[in-house]
From Swiss-Prot:
Entry-linked PANTHER family: DNA MISMATCH REPAIR PROTEIN MSH1, MITOCHONDRIAL, DNA MISMATCH REPAIR PROTEIN MUTS FAMILY MEMBER
Keyword Cell cycle: no
SMART domains linked: MUTSac, MUTSd
Stated name of the protein: DNA mismatch repair protein MutS
HAMAP family, per database record: MutS (MF_00096)
Highest taxon, organism lineage: Bacteria
Gene Ontology biological process terms from the UniProt entry: mismatch repair
Gene this chain is encoded by: mutS
Organism: Orientia tsutsugamushi (strain Ikeda)
SUPFAM superfamilies linked to this entry: DNA repair protein MutS, domain I, DNA repair protein MutS, domain II, DNA repair protein MutS, domain III, P-loop containing nucleoside triphosphate hydrolases
């Protein structure tokens, strides 16, 4: 950020015209924004903003005269086309400052003479985390703004969705911060600028660098945050909003302060923040969330994700709630079973589901409509949404009453049933005021019924029947003057006037006729009546539009008084949509109700991968189902077998079954018994982290380190090919050690797939580990995958067979077979006579080099994160290699 002096020097402020100086003054206070500067019917951009935006939007880069002897770069956006251009700016993470004219040029001239500059002011800053416009945000996903404060090893996170008036505060361990960020997926993250100098903490936000908004440290001070909260909610003490700790107060205050800056005069009406306990939800680490493709595929697309398969919701708010459910599975038995009861209720009443879905799909996005109404950004359609929702809510309740007794609603259905209400008073008010088939724009009027307001009816009469009023006045004047040829005319110089021929001018004797002009053939007059009519006609359209805005504000106020009930109604409709969706897909895809317990059970019978099943069903193929029983004596399954045989699919499908069960949905299986999983970890697939200079193996080790450090005995751990990114012996050693640690230290349920067949001997050493493999058919050197997981171990990898299926040249395959035979003939016996791998891998450890000792001396192990520790190991390795090279020279 430039100082004012540097800024003015850069843009040669003192050589600028008065209007350009006004632009530069406003731009100085909004240096981080693209400034859209209203000039008449256009938003104009200058200097660097013009260059950036013209390229981004494909606009013509023009020039607006000269400034300081140079062409002034300029491009423009028509004001009526703004909404079509804004999404592309916001999608690119640009902040956009909207600067409007606060007066007309005529008003400016009256105020300060001919050379006066029109008053302008930034009325709003659009950012990706604070927008509410339908055209700028995804309909079926939340749009979160977050603020984070880290104190010791706890991160306080506040996040809100301004478009739906949702506000949540949660504390998590700093070790779980990246997992939580991947769950929330905020569009903007507010951090203290002091974090810019803390590289270890800043590393936690590596994947969110483009979304960070740094604010001065005072934003986060407890005292300032406390005042901000009190002012925002108009309360005397912050105790009114719940038991917030000091860091939670800081994040709430930071969010509210940020909103006050960017929203200017249109302040959001967020509810009190909801304080959430992390223990009630399953933790899904960032890697698992990505690899399981819960809400998007690895390439970032919705199609092909789990969400795309299970989402048959029929409303936008229902789609958003399903997105939240899938991102945040529950981890508390009673809460999960309560949801499953609701799903079961609808599953047992499929005709009701069909009828409700037909009704619910008629409900507009009441949630976001209500939010825009509360922040004075309402469109006419938003009010229509409220009206429609009130009407349909009664029909939904009537439909539910066909299978429920109103006096005896099951407790688990109360949150759905009780908020369904009709408000005749509010409905009648909106129905009497609003026209049908409303447009999105409120600027030009035309959305209020004329019958609603006598004044509006008069103005519209003037607009649409002006010729009739002129004709009436003309006939009146002809009668009064006895001049049958009297006319009422109009031109651009005189406006409206009365005209009579010169020979009839003497007949006009009444003083109300004021002489205006005499021509060679006619004399022109005016009257107070005519001037009043002309003024009304000229201003009628503007006055009607302004009156409609006043009526709109009154209607919004009436809705605001019922906002709490309407918010509960929106939630009820969303829940109905989601649970009807669960019942619908469960019936369509042949899902079963899972049994959720508080123990460590895990017994899936004929489980399926629902995404792949849907994909291959389209090809008229059948999905091969598999059992998975992780009981005490086999809570770790070590799975061997060739690539492409279905190991990874099996791993993923069991994780997906757990997630679906714990969001309250039926699952793709014949039966499922699941002890609640508190954390789900997954290490599947290989990926370099090029941005941070980490190899595939380093990424794998960092992710594995996180899993080993954070898993509990209630977790589900899924590991695929641990150790493959290094030498064979190194890889076997790492995989072996990880298995032992999971078995004996963590003692959790685990699926562990590997190519290291040497590991199968661990089944005789680790009592809770059991070997499983993928069934194949090997006949005459021809390999067929049967995709069935069976007990036992693979005796070879079939890598060359897979290469053959992949289409490698025959000459390469034949040579590979020759080499394989030679290697198998000469390979060392890893297990030796006592089947103990550790003895066969003993190596002589040389003395530590001096530089390595110095590195180790400087370390403080208690302050190292797993990621930092691995980086240091690499540094030590490089140091050893360097010293060995120096000895050889």
């Amino acid at each position: 950020m430039l100082t004012q002096e540097d800024f003015r020097n850069k843009y040669q402020y003192h050589q600028a015209t008065p209007m350009l100086q006004q632009y530069l003054d406003i731009k100085f206070t909004h240096q981080c924004c693209i400034l859209l500067f209203r000039v008449g019917d256009f938003y104009e951009l200058f200097f660097d903003d013009a260059i950036v935006v013209s390229k981004l939007l494909g606009l013509v880069l023009a020039k607006k005269g000269k400034h300081a002897g140079q062409d002034l770069p300029m491009c423009g956006i028509p004001y009526h086309a703004l909404e079509s251009y804004l999404p592309r700016l916001v999608e690119q993470e640009h902040k956009v400052a909207l600067c409007e004219q606060l007066e007309s040029p005529e008003e400016a001239k009256k105020r300060n003479g001919y050379k006066a500059v029109v008053k302008r002011e930034v009325v709003r800053i659009l950012t990706s985390g604070t927008i509410t416009e339908e055209s700028l945000i995804k309909a079926n996903a939340p749009n979160y703004l977050a603020a984070i404060v880290i104190y010791k090893d706890i991160a306080s996170i506040g996040y809100c969705d301004v478009s739906t008036a949702e506000f949540i505060v949660i504390d998590v361990s700093i070790h779980n911060l990246t997992s939580e960020l991947s769950r929330i997926n905020p569009k903007e993250i507010i951090l203290s600028e002091s974090l810019q100098h803390n590289s270890s903490l800043l590393a936690l936000f590596d994947n969110y660098k483009q979304k960070i908004v740094y604010q001065v440290e005072s934003y986060f001070s407890f005292n300032k945050a406390q005042r901000t909260i009190q002012n925002y909610y108009e309360i005397i003490t912050i105790d009114s909003i719940g038991s917030l700790n000091s860091t939670q107060v800081s994040v709430v205050g930071a969010i509210l302060e940020y909103l006050s800056i960017v929203q200017k005069h249109s302040k959001s009406k967020l509810p009190f923040p909801q304080i959430v306990s992390y223990e009630n939800f399953m933790l899904i680490d960032a890697s698992a969330r990505k690899n399981l493709e819960l809400t998007s595929t690895l390439s970032g697309n919705l199609k092909g994700s789990l969400l795309s398969v299970i989402d048959a919701t029929v409303t936008n708010q229902g789609g958003r709630l399903l997105h939240k459910f899938l991102s945040t599975p529950l981890a508390e038995v009673n809460l999960i079973n309560s949801r499953l009861q609701i799903t079961d209720f609808f599953y047992q009443n499929l005709q009701l589901v069909e009828n409700l879905r037909e009704l619910v799909k008629l409900v507009p996005d009441i949630e976001r409509a209500l939010s825009r109404i509360l922040i004075a950004k309402a469109l006419p359609k938003d009010l229509e949404s409220i009206k429609i929702s009130l009407k349909i809510a009664l029909s939904i309740k009537k439909e539910l009453n066909k299978v429920l007794e109103e006096e005896n609603i099951p407790k688990y259905l109360e949150e759905i049933y009780n908020p369904l209400f009709g408000d005749d008073e509010l409905y009648d008010l909106l129905d009497s005021a609003l026209l049908d088939d409303l447009s999105n724009s409120a600027n030009d009027g035309g959305f209020i019924k004329s019958s609603y307001s006598t004044k509006l009816e008069e103005l519209r009469n003037l607009i649409y029947n002006s010729s009739h009023f002129i004709e009436q006045l003309k006939l009146q004047y002809r009668q009064e003057t006895c001049i049958e040829t009297l006319k009422i005319c109009h031109n651009n110089v005189w406006g409206m006037f009365i005209e009579v021929s010169s020979k009839n001018a003497h007949k006009i004797t009444d003083s109300k006729f004021v002489h205006k002009q005499t021509t060679t053939t006619a004399v022109r007059f005016t009257t107070t009546e005519l001037q009043t009519l002309e003024a009304k006609m000229l201003n009628a359209k503007t006055m009607a539009a302004a009156l409609e805005q006043e009526i709109l504000a009154e209607l919004c106020k009436a809705i605001s008084l019922k906002s709490e009930k309407l918010s509960h109604l929106a939630k009820s409709i969303s829940l109905i949509d989601v649970f009807c969706n669960f019942a619908y897909i469960s019936h369509e895809f042949n899902y079963c109700r899972p049994e959720i317990t508080s123990d460590l059970a895990f017994n899936i019978v004929n489980g399926r991968h629902t995404v792949i099943e849907k994909l291959i069903t389209k090809k008229h193929e059948s999905f091969i189902s598999n059992d998975c029983n992780l009981q005490n004596d086999q809570r770790i399954w070590l799975i061997t077998g060739p690539n492409m045989a279905g190991k990874s699919t099996f791993l993923r499908q069991n994780a997906i079954i757990v997630i679906l069960a714990q969001i309250g949905c039926y699952v793709p299986a014949q039966s499922a018994q699941i002890g609640v999983v508190d954390k789900l970890f997954s290490r599947i697939g290989a990926a370099d982290d090029l941005a941070s200079g980490q190899s595939t193996f380093m990424v794998e080790m960092v992710e594995t380190s996180v899993i080993l450090a954070q898993s509990t005995f209630r977790s589900l751990v899924i590991l695929d090919e641990i150790g493959r990114g290094t030498s064979t012996y190194d890889g076997i050693s790492i995989a072996w050690s990880c298995l032992e640690y999971i078995h004996s230290n963590i003692r959790c349920r685990c699926l562990f797939a590997t190519h290291y067949h040497e590991l199968v001997d661990l089944a005789s050493k680790l009592q809770s580990l059991k070997n499983f493999t993928v069934k194949i058919h090997d006949s005459n050197d021809k390999l067929s995958f049967l995709y069935k997981i069976i007990e036992g171990a693979a005796n070879k990898s079939y890598g060359i067979h897979v290469a053959e299926l992949a289409g490698l040249p025959r000459i390469v395959l034949n040579r590979a077979k020759e080499i394989l035979l030679e290697l198998e003939h000469n390979k060392a016996d890893i297990n030796q006579s006592n089947n103990n791998i550790t003895k066969s891998m003993d190596i002589a450890v040389p003395p530590y080099p001096v530089k390595t000792i110095e590195i180790i001396k400087q370390l403080n192990p208690d302050q190292l994160t797993p990621k930092e520790a691995l980086s240091i190991i690499y540094k030590i390795k490089n140091t050893i290699l360097l010293e060995e090279d120096e000895k050889m020279i």
